[in-house]
Each structure stands twice: as C-alpha cells, then as structure tokens.
C-alpha cells in the first residue's frame, strides 16, 4: 500500500474536479479518514504531507492523538462518528473538530468540557439530508434552531455543515443531495453572518467529484488513501 501515491491520486482528482467548476484547488480540504488504521499508516500519510485526520471512535482517536503529541507531531484531528453523551469529555479535551453535532445536549456538554486553555472546539452540524433512519443528523428544518443555540456557547465555534448522503451510483441523485446541502449552507451563512461559517464537509471516496461540483469545501477520504478497512462494512467510505 503506497499511501503517498494514493494521496497524490486523490489530490489530482480534487484538482480536476475543481478545474471543471473554475474553483481553486485550495478551496477543498482533504480529510484523511484514519479509523481502524494503525499509527504507522497515519505516519506515512503525514510524511507525505497530510496533516488533517478523521476518527470515528473516541478511544481509538484519543490514543492516536496522544501518541502523535508525545512525538511532537502537530496534526489536526476531526471526530466524525456518532457521539454518545458519556464520551463528550474525551472529544472536548482532545479533538480540534467535531463534525457530527446534532443535539443541543451534546453541544452543551462539549462547551462545558472544553478546556479553557484550548481554542474553541470547531463544530459542524450534521444534517440527515437523505432522511435515513439509520443515519445520525438532524432534519434540515431543525438546523437554524441548533445553530442559534451553538452561537451562544463560547467554547464552541460553529464552522458549517456535514452530511453523509445515502450511497448511490446515480450521479443525479448524488448531486441532488449535495445541492440541498449547499442551499442550507448558504442559508446558515446569511442567518449567522458573525460566525465563521466556511466549511461544508461532504463527499467521500465514491462521490467526491459530485460533492466538489456542488460546493464541498472538505472531502472525507479513507479507502482510497489507506485501502479497505479492517472490518466488513459497505457504508461511509
């Protein structure tokens, strides 16, 4: 597994997708999804220039964060999995970003538990854009209520939205979901002009070009960088 080669391929695909939309490649950030991957794989990605990583499991993520901090390696860590209220403290204390915020209760706990010597925790509201019962996230019509709640929490910084649309090979269906997200993103920026709303996290290994076409500013890629995961699943590549 040549991680540097894989990262180069992904960056080329990002560049191609951006050129087709007359976008600067620098407007799309690559988040390497490193869940279930060993420290050695993350280190290889870091040595190839990758500095932002996404983890789905709290304890696994914290162990990796602590290892790299002990080595003096400064990485940016995003929590991208569903979060139970009894695990909020670890996310608040260790991660830089939390992308799956979908409840005021979780927001309150993260705000209370964020160390005061750290910068505010960057958060994204997760939208259940395909209305799937199996997926986390709030309904689109609930977005503004939660966003205004977060706005009043001093140790959180609302940066935008995140979504995991229902997997499909149909390009039109992909783009339909992503365009809905872009509309919500623009609405959020208009309603909260004083917040740093600049991040629309959508697009994974199989639908990245469609996501970039529809305005994504952050793509979450795991399989195409690190290879197949170490357990059997068909979703959330």
Curated annotation (Swiss-Prot):
Domain of life of the native organism: Bacteria
Q: CDD domains given for it?
A: PLPDE_III_Yggs_like
Cellular component (GO) terms are: cytoplasm
Alphabetically, the GO molecular function entries are: pyridoxal phosphate binding
Protein name (record):
Pyridoxal phosphate homeostasis protein
Stored InterPro entries:
Ala_racemase_N, PLP-binding_barrel, PyrdxlP_homeostasis
Entry keywords, A to Z: Pyridoxal phosphate
Q: Which family does it belong to?
A: Belongs to the pyridoxal phosphate-binding protein YggS/PROSC family.
- Write out the function statement from the record: Pyridoxal 5'-phosphate (PLP)-binding protein, which is involved in PLP homeostasis.
What HAMAP family does the record point to?
Answer: PLP_homeostasis
PTM N6-(pyridoxal phosphate)lysine: at which residues?
Answer: 35
């Amino acid at each position: 597994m040549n991680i540097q080669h894989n990262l180069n391929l992904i960056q080329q695909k990002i560049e191609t997708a951006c050129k087709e939309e007359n976008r600067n490649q620098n407007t799309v950030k690559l988040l390497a999804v490193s869940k279930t991957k060993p420290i050695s794989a993350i280190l290889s990605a870091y040595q190839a220039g990758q500095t932002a990583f996404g983890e789905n499991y709290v304890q696994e993520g914290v162990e990796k964060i602590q290892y790299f901090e002990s080595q003096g390696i400064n990485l940016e860590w995003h929590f991208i999995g569903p979060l139970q209220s009894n695990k909020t403290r670890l996310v608040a204390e260790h991660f830089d970003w939390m992308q799956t915020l979908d409840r005021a209760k979780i927001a309150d706990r993260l705000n209370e538990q964020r160390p005061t010597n750290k910068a505010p925790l960057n958060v994204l509201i997760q939208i259940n854009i395909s209305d799937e019962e199996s997926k986390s996230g709030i309904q689109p019509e609930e977005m503004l209520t939660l966003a205004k709640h977060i706005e009043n929490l001093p140790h959180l910084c609302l940066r935008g939205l995140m979504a995991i649309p229902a997997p499909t090979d149909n390009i039109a269906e992909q783009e339909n979901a992503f365009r809905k997200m872009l509309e919500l993103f623009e609405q959020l920026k208009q309603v909260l002009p004083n917040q740093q709303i600049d991040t629309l996290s959508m697009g994974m290994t199989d639908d990245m070009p469609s996501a970039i076409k529809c305005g994504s500013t952050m793509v979450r890629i795991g399989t195409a960088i690190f290879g197949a995961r170490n357990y059997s699943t068909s979703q959330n590549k």
